[in-house]
Amino acid sequence: MSVPIVPTDFAHAPKLEQLKNEFVECYDTDDSRKFFITRSPGRVNLIGEHIDYCQFSVLPMAIENDLMLACRLTSESENPSITLTNHDSNFAQRKFDLPLDGSLIEIDPSVSDWSNYFKCGLLVAQQFLQEKYNFKGPVHGMEIYVKGDIPSGGGLSSSAAFICAVSLAIIYSNVPAGTPILKDELTKTTAVAEHHVGVNNGGMDQAASICGIEGHALYVEFKPELKATPFKFPEDLPISFLIANTLVVSNKAETGPVNYNLRVVEVTVAANVLAQKFGVTLQTEGNLGKGTLRNFMDSYYTKYDKSCRKPWDGEIQTGIERLNKMLQLVEETLDPNGYTLDHAVELCGCESISQFTELYLTNFPVRFQRLKLFQRAKHVYSEALRVLKALQLFQKGESNFFEEFGALMNESQESCDKLYECSCPETDSICEIALKNGSFGSRLTGAGWGGCTVHLCSTDTVDSVKSALTEQYYNLRFPELTAEELEDAIIISKPSLGSVLYE
């Protein structure tokens, strides 16, 4: 499927007309040069937390809040440049020249500036143009006006939406007219863009932003390749999702050694302890290059299942059977009391603490007394299982979808809290308030330790959930919030359309 390119009478599209008017106010009214708008939405992950870096699939959706770029090609031919203006005055205007020889734009990740994210989208688009079309010249210069309503820093992937809209604009303006821009190619192109500013993401955000479909969630797979498959919510159900920000920010530099970084180490060590126990070899994949819990599952079945010595191909029923087996092995093999460093060294087959440290503890700073391998592995396998059970609900289209999907979300929150320990008191409080006031399922979304929560509601109950959260959480904990800040903290959205280009 290709990104929709929609011929548009801007005078009959109020939101787009407003954006064009603001562009004209910023620049000028020269209509002789090509003008177009690219749009990409934010996303929220409905289920499947902290399992993407274990190579298991996740279930996000695109939200209605989006980011748009109003773009106009410049007439300059000798010195092409990009001029960036942001509707938000907190982001100063930027202008930079484009390499005349067609070489890739340079990015300095040590400099924290919003234009670096534009350059990320530009750079990967340049690479795509060179690889697919043998594009050699400099890309077209443009004047660009940026506007969006995705709260930044709220865990809804505003940066990914920005990059997707940028890459779409660069590719569209540098290929022959009428050339389709395929969604899967744009997804794979942008999936690695943020790596250029030091963000080690895996592609879920970009897949959801680009491939979103109204009324659908997206089953995003990472193996054998990045792929997004839409699953439709039951048509006759008035579904709404409420996304509430705890307004708690976890400083990753300070808390990483005992939170996120440590979880990456624990799931990797768990995979290797299981591999040693069952005599299988893991591929050099994952964040530490030492294999993942998905690798262990595939290696286990390759060795022990005589009927099918193949890695899992994503088929739902097979995945459910295999994940249930993995949960059984975790219960039988790993100790709920945790592992000291010495014990982990022995079970991983390392010869010394120094060897274990070199293999597992040097990529990221970590601190621990005991490694909770049982809890982390149980969360990963059970969360991956919940994703597949959610897909079964989509396929059945059952009348009690609210209750059953909500139950999976609640189980996910329980697992994130008790097994992965990535919740926090504020998240727990928001979920409790929401469930008492009309939410069918409430859970954290994103990395956790603060950040956002997501709640499954009906259109009949979503307003009561919002009112309860306003009165019982925000007004009590953050009485200084302005009306605008409160509006950013609570977002109501239905599953939305992904990237679009208007010309």
Curated annotation (Swiss-Prot):
Pathway: Carbohydrate metabolism; galactose metabolism. It comes from the Eukaryota. The keyword Coiled coil does not apply. One of its GO terms (molecular function) is ATP binding. Keywords: ATP-binding, Carbohydrate metabolism, Galactose metabolism, Kinase, Nucleotide-binding, Transferase. InterPro entries: Galactokinase, Galactokinase_CS, GalKase_N, GHMP_kinase_C_dom, GHMP_kinase_C_sf, GHMP_kinase_N_dom, GHMP_knse_ATP-bd_CS, Mevalonate/galactokinase. The active site is at residue 205. The record marks 43 as: Transition state stabilizer. Induction: The GAL1 gene is a member of the family of galactose inducible, glucose-repressible genes (which include GAL2, GAL3, GAL7, GAL10, GAL80, and MELI). Disulfide bonds: none annotated. This is Galactokinase. It comes from Kluyveromyces lactis (strain ATCC 8585 / CBS 2359 / DSM 70799 / NBRC 1267 / NRRL Y-1140 / WM37) (Yeast).
